[in-house]
């Protein structure tokens, strides 16, 4: 009898909910803006989360998953006035982001924990995400990162975040920055 390999086993995902969405979402806006040399923010790159009870919301998301909503926090770069600057990833790519003051306060009130406490590699559901384009000086200041091949650096502004799975599963896979794939 021949071996059967399920399509879900062809890629090494650490969660069935964590799918590729960063590259396909960010790249078209970057390429369009690079041509026009105008860098407006893109609102609702990811739509808002439902305003239900946390358990109900997580359960609802599990039943009807939208792949663009799941991320893992890979690194915290800095915290300044309750704004948290971090690197997140989907199943294939890394991107810089920041969690707004309202997002952090909402998370910490609901979970009675700091957003930076034991959340590295934790699976989050995010919502109300805006794609912004930052200059190199801002990225160096807030993230201590530089991407010299880019004119502007895409950064995600996250206004809603809910912990979906508290397991801190790290991956042996080396993820690439979304910035390495943005050149035409």
From Swiss-Prot:
Belongs to the EST3 family. Component of the telomerase complex. It comes from Kluyveromyces lactis (strain ATCC 8585 / CBS 2359 / DSM 70799 / NBRC 1267 / NRRL Y-1140 / WM37) (Yeast). It is found in: Nucleus; Chromosome, Telomere. Disulfide bonds: none annotated. One of its GO terms (cellular component) is chromosome, telomeric region. GO terms for biological process: telomere maintenance via telomerase. The keyword Nucleus applies. GO terms for molecular function: telomeric DNA binding. This is Telomere replication protein EST3. Component of the telomerase complex involved in telomere replication. Stimulates RNA/DNA heteroduplex unwinding which favors the telomere replication by the telomerase. It comes from the Eukaryota. Keywords: Chromosome, Nucleus, Telomere. Pfam families: TPP1.
